[in-house]
Amino acid sequence: IAVPVVVIFGLMAGWDLKPCRLWPVLARNMFLTGAMFVYFGCLGFFPIAAVAAGLFTAPVLVMFIDAIWSRRSIGPIRLVTAFVGFIGTILVLKPDVGGLGWANLIPVSAGLMYAIGNVATRKWCEGESAVALLWSYMFLMLVFGGFGVIYLYFNPGDPGSYLTRGWVWPSATVWGWIWLQAVFSLVGIGF
């Protein structure tokens, strides 16, 4: 829904939808798309608070990744601020991770990919228009989501499973919610 809306509105408004540098934009969008797929995939296996806490590691990780990428040190005030913010996130979400283990790093990998995508936006995509970044990101989400739907159509899994059930046509009410969410996502993210 979002891709045609952005493209049609962008063409009508005379926006330049073509990225200046395709490969850096594509690489950046791969990280962000991977983050969202891991995030939503984890919702079927982990408590929502644990998944959200994993994604909300991104701001702290952005600071560290940017420091490594740019080869500059992190000052004590930024370190303390990031630590306090991260602890605040944990206290608000109260993730019941049931004992830390390797599996708990899966939601954190969404935060890591999201952080890399954010740093890559600044490092690789300087000069790109926001609308070119937005529609190309949404398009990549559409492509990977489409592959998933096609795969599960021909190889349906357990109908009761969150991730492996085949395509189910949404009801009119659900379509209404999907459209509403798409419009507000576009307003919130890009317009």
Where are these regions (language model features)?
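Structural motif at transmembrane-helix junctions in multi-pass transporters
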Residues: 38-55, 130-131, 190-191
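Alpha-helical transmembrane segments of compact multi-pass small-molecule transporters, enriched
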Residues: 4-5, 54-68, 83, 140, ...
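Hydrophobic alpha-helical transmembrane segments of multi-pass integral membrane proteins
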Residues: 1-8, 128-184
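Hydrophobic transmembrane alpha-helices of multi-pass small-molecule transport proteins
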Residues: 77-94
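Glycine-/small-residue-enriched transmembrane alpha-helix faces in small-molecule transporters
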Residues: 1, 98-123
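Transmembrane alpha-helices of multi-pass small-molecule transport proteins
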Residues: 1-34, 113-117, 136-153
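C-terminal transmembrane-helix exit sites in multi-pass transporters
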Residues: 10, 41, 58-80
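Loop-to-transmembrane-helix transition segments
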Residues: 14-40, 102-110, 159-188
